[in-house]
């Protein structure tokens, strides 16, 4: 459901430092290009291969700095302050754990299982720390973001929620989505100011109903074609030798197509659900209790962009991946906005004057990214 029409870049620029009109959402934009990002991407790929993956940490920094810097709100881009060494150290710790785990699992299976259980206990803490790291290395107008969520909230949002959703075959997925967005949104800070969101479970279920309908309809179509070829499947079950070579080939093609359709159905449903839930959660969010956020992604358009991006990337053996990433970033940014209550210049001046809860010592002492 489209909640508001996109604003032109000119309109956004005019509102950069004045009072935002009532109901006027300032849209984000993405100023990068596929051609420009391709140069960064290809160097990242080549250096990652040459260094046997070590450079991937610095590749992540270069990629994020490009996308953050080209994500523009009110004429100013975001900044990404992480360093490659921080990301590399975190990855080396995780890599060392995996080596120890596999060694123990091979020679002392019980110890390996115990180490796995210990790791699972630490997952909520790692998730909370990862979100904290990502927030704290991000800034806008020289003011850092922060994340204050605890491991207990991460356990509910990222462990309990997915388990409940899986056990109920997705019926309680909206509840899990609500927990996740509330955990992230209610613990995010910009300077000393807090974000908050409380998405309606009923509205999320409306998005879920659309995805559920896609799955049911898709499975009915697959089931119908399977019924038409019931004789072939029945013969194959009774004895594969009874099938001719042509029928065996046809059966193989049908099975492959069935798998493709299965993943396509659930993939499309997941994308439709993701866009819908994002719209609900972002549009229910506020900043500093009075500035409203907005997301009005078109479910159909978002799904088409995501699927076509994957297809184009596969067909071109990955060479069009930069174009696909820029295409998605541009679309999502253009359908994300903020409505400021008051004079924008005064709002950001006050936030900058208050300062940030994140000190420079975080980058030197605590700042490691474990990839969660």
Show which residues each predicted segment covers:
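Alpha-helical transmembrane spans of integral membrane proteins, capturing the lipid-embedded, hydrophobic core
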Residues: 37, 41, 45, 49, ...
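Membrane-helix interface segments in multi-pass membrane proteins
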Residues: 2-6, 60, 101-119, 218-270, ...
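Membrane-interface extramembranous regions at the lipid-water interface
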Residues: 3-43, 58-92, 129-158, 176-211, ...
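Short hydrophobic helical membrane-anchoring segments positioned at the boundary
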Residues: 313, 343-372
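Long, contiguous internal "core" modules enriched in hydrophobic/ aromatic residues
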Residues: 124, 144-271, 275-276
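Selective recognition of hydrophobic, aromatic-rich stretches within alpha-helical transmembrane segments
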Residues: 49-63, 107-137, 166-187, 248-281, ...
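Alpha-helical membrane-embedding segments
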Residues: 96-111, 147-160, 171-179, 215-233, ...
